[in-house]
A protein has these predicted regions:
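PLP-dependent amino-acid enzyme catalytic core
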Residues: 1-169
Length: 169
């Protein structure tokens, strides 16, 4: 189902529930994988592991970046990477560039996901808002919504680097 862009969270939830109900009427067993359910902890844990792998690859290459910039929607990737880096005592800082939400909303989501993952992994390391940065300066018309400014940026990137990027990036 295609839904209108720029829906608020409540409208998205209603749409998800409508699709779930339609599928249930067809005899299927659909589930909405909400970011606060077990799925969220599993996704976050995967990125805790990814932090260790990333640090290994960086060590092998001899590179020591001070920041790791990533896109952040629900915050699970940022939570896992930041938790993993902190647990492994890496000075690298996660810079979570928000795709849709504002920092005051996304920051506690990242903390929540990290806390659940740490609990499941039985880590004593805990993440706080001091351990990562949420950048919400680039949230515009919506995640992946093509605007004239975005189209211009895509053309500029294509000319400069010889490749076309997806509007999400």
């Amino acid at each position: 189902r295609i839904v209108a862009p720029n829906l608020d969270a409540a409208s998205i939830m209603i749409s998800q529930e409508e699709v779930r109900d339609e599928m249930a009427r067809e005899g299927r067993r659909p589930a909405i994988l909400d970011r606060h359910l077990e799925y969220g902890a599993d996704a976050t844990i995967a990125y805790v592991d990814a932090a260790e792998e990333l640090l290994g690859q960086l060590a092998a290459s001899g590179k020591k970046p001070h920041s790791l910039f990533i896109a952040a929607g629900a915050g699970m990737t940022a939570a896992g990477l930041a938790l993993g880096l902190k647990h492994l005592r890496s000075p690298m800082r996660v810079m979570a560039v928000s795709t849709s939400g504002r920092a005051p909303d996304l920051t506690p989501e990242i903390e929540h996901h990290a806390a659940r993952a740490a609990e499941r992994l039985r880590l004593t390391t805990r993440l706080s808002s001091e351990d990562f940065t949420v950048i919400d300066d680039y949230v515009a018309s919506g995640y992946g919504v093509l605007t004239p400014a975005l189209a211009d940026a895509m053309r500029l990137f294509a000319r400069a680097h010889g490749m076309v990027i997806d509007p999400v990036y």
